[in-house]
A protein has these predicted regions:
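Leu/Val/Ala/Ile-rich N-terminal alpha-helices, chiefly Sec-type signal peptides and the beginnings
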Residues: 26-108
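Amphipathic alpha-helical coiled-coil segments
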Residues: 70-73, 77-80, 118, 125, ...
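Leucine-rich amphipathic alpha-helices with coiled-coil/heptad-repeat character
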Residues: 84, 91, 132, 136-139, ...
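Register-specific recognition of a single heptad position within extended alpha-helical repeats
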Residues: 57, 64, 98, 105, ...
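Sec-dependent bacterial lipoprotein signal peptides
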Residues: 1-26
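Extended, non-membrane alpha-helical segments enriched in charged/polar residues
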Residues: 68, 75, 176, 180-183, ...
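Extended amphipathic alpha-helical interaction segments
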Residues: 100, 108-200
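A cross-kingdom marker for long, charged
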Residues: 191-236
Length: 236
């Protein structure tokens, strides 16, 4: 009986030690994962340029639960890249293709399609920003991680969102005006003649209407270019 009690008393502290070692091992693992994630944010995400990298299987294992934190950044970044590539770069390409008056007609359908999609694009980006902000606000991060993550969040989410906000309205106004010019030229049919990279109308009234339509284009083009440049810089 005495021997049994002795073993019982001896076994209890051993179990306690094992529990302490086990728990401390868990805490160390979480700390290592957080440290690896912080290093990734500072040395990769902050220097990634236009596109955030997709996490590898090894990185997901290294970061553990912080993979979901990164998903907030990566998800919004993907939305912005899609908006720039599919929604706004086609506008830039069509605008750059307009070199002579005939090009207003050849580019009006691509520009009309782009203009029609810009409103939907603006709503999608707004929803993506709201979701990212909500997920960011719900995070409970350690003191060493939070300032680093917030810095990357500003670079990846806040700054691009602020830059895109004026770009889409500028693109809508500019593309709509370009389409109107192309439609007007097309409506004149064979009355219009193109000479030496210029355009001629049979009446002064037609010429005046054309000049009134192209009048706002210079300032609209400038506003769009400035907003586009700001957005490109913000996503790099």
């Amino acid at each position: 009986m005495a021997t049994g009690k002795s073993c019982s008393r001896w076994f209890a502290p051993v179990v306690a030690l094992l529990m302490v070692f086990s728990l401390s091992g868990c805490f160390d693992k979480e700390g290592d994962q957080r440290k690896a994630f912080i290093d990734f944010l500072q040395n990769t995400a902050m220097r990634s340029g236009e596109r955030l990298p997709t996490l590898t299987a090894d990185q997901k294992k290294q970061f553990g639960p912080f993979v979901s934190d990164y998903a907030i950044l990566y998800g919004y970044s993907q939305q912005v890249n899609q908006a720039m590539d599919s929604g706004l770069r086609p506008v830039v390409d069509s605008v750059n293709a307009i070199r002579v008056p005939q090009d207003y007609m050849t580019q009006r359908e691509p520009l009309r399609q782009a203009n029609g999609s810009l409103g939907v694009l603006a709503q999608q980006l707004q929803n993506a920003k709201l979701q990212a902000d909500a997920a960011h606000g719900a995070l409970k991060q350690a003191d060493d991680l939070k300032p680093v993550f917030d810095q990357v969040y500003k670079k990846v989410v806040t700054v691009p969102a602020d830059a895109l906000q004026p770009l889409i309205p500028a693109a809508q106004i500019f593309t709509q005006q370009l389409v109107q010019v192309g439609d007007y030229i097309a409506q004149q049919g064979e009355q219009v003649s193109f000479v030496a990279n210029g355009i001629q109308f049979p009446t002064s009234q037609q010429a005046s209407q054309y000049n009134a339509l192209i009048g706002p284009l210079a300032s609209q083009h400038q506003a769009f270019n400035q907003a586009w440049t700001a957005a490109v810089n913000a996503t790099q």
